[in-house]
Amino acid sequence: MSVLTSLLLRGLTGSARRLPVPRAKVHSMPPEEELGTLEKAIALTSCFVSLFLPAGWILSHLEDYKRPE
């Protein structure tokens, strides 16, 4: 990297380093009800099925999607 490029990059990023970053004022409370083991298992299973079942079906039927040559 040339000296000119490094000076240009330093000039562009130098002003951004001096800007204050506002802190987010996010406060949350603990949950009213804890999730049970069964509810967590159902949620994890539904996420797994909704993500991996369509992908697995497409991959298993990949030959059907190929054009005959």
UniProtKB/Swiss-Prot annotation:
Pathway: Energy metabolism; oxidative phosphorylation
Example of a GO cellular component annotation carried by this entry: mitochondrial inner membrane
Record's comment on post-translational modification: In response to mitochondrial stress, the precursor protein is ubiquitinated by the SIFI complex in the cytoplasm before mitochondrial import, leading to its degradation. Within the SIFI complex, UBR4 initiates ubiquitin chain that are further elongated or branched by KCMF1.
Topology feature Mitochondrial matrix, residues: 26-36
Keywords on record: Membrane, Mitochondrion, Mitochondrion inner membrane, Transit peptide, Transmembrane, Transmembrane helix, Ubl conjugation
Presequence extent in this chain: 1-25
The protein's assembly and partners: Component of the cytochrome c oxidase (complex IV, CIV), a multisubunit enzyme composed of 14 subunits. The complex is composed of a catalytic core of 3 subunits MT-CO1, MT-CO2 and MT-CO3, encoded in the mitochondrial DNA, and 11 supernumerary subunits COX4I, COX5A, COX5B, COX6A, COX6B, COX6C, COX7A, COX7B, COX7C, COX8 and NDUFA4, which are encoded in the nuclear genome.
Name this polypeptide is given: Cytochrome c oxidase subunit 8A, mitochondrial
Biological source species: Theropithecus gelada (Gelada baboon)
